[in-house]
Amino acid sequence: MNNSSELIAVINGFRNSGRFCDIDIVINDERINAHRLILSGASEYFSILFSSDFIDSNKYEVNLSHLDYQSVNDLIDYIYGIPLSLTNDIVKYILSTADFLQIGSAITECENYILKNLCSRNCIDFYIYADKYNNKKIETASFNTILLNILRLINDENFKYLTEESMIKFLSDDMLNIKNEDFAPLILIKWLESTQQPCTVELLRCLRISLLSPQVIKSLYSHRLVGSIYECITFLNNISFLDESFPRYHSIELISIGISNSHDKISINCYNRKKNTWDIISSRRYRCSFAVAVLDNIIYMMGGYDQSPYRSSKVIAYNTCTNSWIYDIPELKYPRSNCGGVADDEYIYCIGGIRDQDSSLISSIDRWKPSKPYWQTYAKIREPKCDMGVAMLNGLIYVIGGVVKGDTCTDTLESLSQDGWMMHQRLPIKMSNMSTIVHAGKIYISGGYNNSSVVNGISNLVLSYNPIYDEWTKLSSLNIPRINPALWSVHNKLYVGGGISDDIQTNTSETYDKEKDCWTLDNGHMLPRNYIMYKCEPIKHKYPLEKTQYTNDFLKYLESFIGS
């Protein structure tokens, strides 16, 4: 006798011939003979049953008629060394039986089989099963598979068997794999139609209402399973009072723009969620000290230096939808560098900077509307400056800090509207070269230079400005002081990355924890190179449907974009 497998084979031979068998498992009219000792060694259920007062020690049979005979028989064979023969059709029955009999190794083997074979064709079936039998491992895996394949599953025959509670979980999840929020109501409507169940307010609350197009909102109003429910109509009538929603994880692409070594190319990088790395998707010959603005998913780069010693008036752009460069854009009114860039729904703005002729500071704000042949002067800053923070919030252009005459930083904060300039609460410290972002109705700035006289102190400060109360709040400082970093917001979280620290460009990133008010180094968003950063922008996926007129079959039209 060399090993345990040979021993179990001999014992199985005894079972087949009836030798030493001391128990019969009875299931309806079927009997399975076995040995108490062997069953007790493999099954916690049998171990407790045979070593307690559950049955008379002299009794030679156990009735398990509430279980599936074939599954019990397969598991008894498994205990006696015969491998399980698993398929998608039978694995659920064997797993639930193994779970009842508490045969740990069989449970693990069945779970591993399901996890290995889990796909869009069976994930709903396994999710319903796991939910019923409280198997968290399979439930989590199948839940994530449904999230990933949700648009493929809305026409699956099992889609209608998902419960309202399950649909609330799916529709609420940030990881729901849709590239545009308009697809979430489509998922909801397809489920309502398959179940013929009227909509509820709880289901509508799962949608990111503020991100929906007017056409889809109209589709919700007009659908019989939504529009006929008074509570649902009341909810939709009050959507203007709902808080702003954050896009789902898959509905945006995170794009960064930067340069690494001197005279290196401009790099356009896209964040790869699966690998937690940045992929360089395009590059273009060297340019530095330019302004960046994003409009309609096109990244515009204005002015700066190229490989010549002179400032440039050229404007180039990168289309994130077509992954192509655009060069036929009207030039700025004159060459400039170290300027600021923002955009509203119509215009791109180039603000301040340094002029090429005599390196004088610029006060003009020029703007350009795509399709127009030239740039126009829109306004002038009160004090000429460069390297300031700029932001567009609530239709106002904010200009923050910057470098003014005498190479000193300033602490001014002013906003421009159609009525002119307005001064606001000054910065707590004079700053320039910081990164700026609008997040959750506030302006955030981080890093840069700070000094009351000569520009020379690298900052790790992070500040937020509340326009309602006209006040600045100091947040926890960055771990690494840096100038010209990128500050960005994704899924209600703040990140900062790149820039220059101690005269060396860095590729490190940090994440802000709002509850703990602290920044932590974030290896997941570490940049591919040491970058001076010009922008890190979440790009929302757009579809042609956004400019389509509403029709009664708009949701069917929307469905035609699945897979595109």
From Swiss-Prot:
Its main location: host cell. The BTB domain is responsible for the interaction with CUL3 while the Kelch repeat domains supposely serve to recruit the cellular substrates. Probable substrate-specific adapter of CUL3-containing E3 ubiquitin-protein ligases which mediate the ubiquitination and subsequent proteasomal degradation of host target proteins. It comes from the Viruses. Residues 21-88 form the BTB domain. Kelch repeats lie at residues 252-297, 298-346, 347-395, 397-441, 442-492, 494-539. It comes from Camelpox virus (strain CMS). Keywords: Host cytoplasm, Host-virus interaction, Kelch repeat, Modulation of host E3 ubiquitin ligases by virus, Modulation of host ubiquitin pathway by virus, Repeat, Ubl conjugation pathway. Interacts (via BTB domain) with host CUL3. The keyword Repeat applies. The gene is KBTB1. One of its GO terms (cellular component) is host cell cytoplasm. GO terms for biological process: symbiont-mediated perturbation of host ubiquitin-like protein modification. Residues 123-219 form the BACK domain. Pfam families: BACK, BTB, Kelch_1. SMART domains: BACK (SM00875), BTB (SM00225), Kelch (SM00612). Signal peptide: none annotated. It is found in: Host cytoplasm. This is Kelch repeat and BTB domain-containing protein 1.
